[in-house]
From Swiss-Prot:
GO molecular function, one term: structural constituent of ribosome
GO biological process, one term: translation
Keywords per UniProt: Ribonucleoprotein, Ribosomal protein
Gene3D superfamilies per record: Ribosomal protein L39e (1.10.1620.10)
PROSITE patterns for this protein: RIBOSOMAL_L39E
Family: Belongs to the eukaryotic ribosomal protein eL39 family.
Protein known as: Large ribosomal subunit protein eL39
Superkingdom of origin organism: Archaea
Gene Ontology cellular component list: cytosolic large ribosomal subunit
Keyword Ribosomal protein: yes
Organism listed in the record: Pyrococcus abyssi (strain GE5 / Orsay)
Gene it is expressed from: rpl39e
HAMAP family in the cross-refs: Ribosomal_eL39
Length: 51
């Protein structure tokens, strides 16, 4: 990836990075382990973003 990125692309990548987190532990505890997985979780090698 290029070192000099346009700001819009950089912001999109940052947003995708923030969204790509696990389900918080307090949510798992609160829902009594009904919610364990994150349906929109993305792996960097398997699923690529539209850039």
């Amino acid at each position: 990836m290029a070192r000099n990125k346009p700001l819009a692309k950089k912001l999109r990548l940052a947003k995708a990075m923030k969204q790509n987190r696990r389900v918080p532990v307090w949510v798992i505890v609160k829902t009594n382990r009904r919610v364990l997985t994150h349906p929109k979780r993305r792996h960097w090698r398997r699923t690529k973003l539209k850039e």
